[in-house]
Design a protein with these regions (language model features):
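Second RecA-like catalytic domain
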Residues: 1-169
């Protein structure tokens, strides 16, 4: 009921509950990726969902905690941990695509980001997008790698207020 998956008067599934029941993920993650698809902010929704299902990409080494915190603040958006992760992941991913793994590894090291966590997020994003295709929330043939911010599925990817609403729904 906390995910609005049951009706108030009966134990029948709502439309959302029906779709959540088909996904092999926690309901809160399923709800986030479905709403991300519905509200055309797939890319950030997938990143947030993937980060919720894995470890945080931010490292906080005991001997360099202050520098790590400063680095994290550089990625910060609207005091939101989730949106901060979206920004850090997006920069790492763009650098990896443009300049390769070596540059992305340096970026991760310099910014106190866990490469393992970033790769896990990347893999989970692919899995979650495939699930959305399977249940019809993304078109057949959807390719996450080609779905930039200008694609139909990401028309609202930069709308911070909408992203926060999707997170809180």
């Amino acid at each position: 009921k906390t995910c609005a998956s049951l009706t108030d008067t009966t134990t029948q599934l709502t439309a959302l509950g029906f779709h959540l029941a088909t996904l092999p993920v926690e309901p809160r993650i399923g709800k986030l990726i479905i709403y991300g698809a519905l509200f055309l902010c797939v890319d950030p929704a997938l990143t947030i969902a993937a980060s919720m299902a894995s470890k945080s990409p931010f490292l906080s080494p005991f001997d360099n905690r202050e520098a790590a915190n400063e680095s994290r603040k550089a990625f910060s958006i609207d005091d939101s941990d989730h949106l901060t992760i979206v920004t850090a992941f997006k920069k790492w991913r763009e650098l990896r695509i443009r300049k390769g793994d070596g540059a992305a590894s340096r970026f991760a090291r310099e910014n106190f980001l866990s490469r393992i966590a970033l790769f896990q997020i990347e893999e989970l994003r692919k899995q979650f997008s495939s699930l959305l295709v399977e249940i019809g929330f993304l078109p057949a043939g959807f390719r996450l790698e080609r779905a930039g911010e200008t694609s139909d599925s990401n028309k609202n990817a930069k709308n911070i207020s909408l992203l926060k609403a999707v997170l809180c729904a």
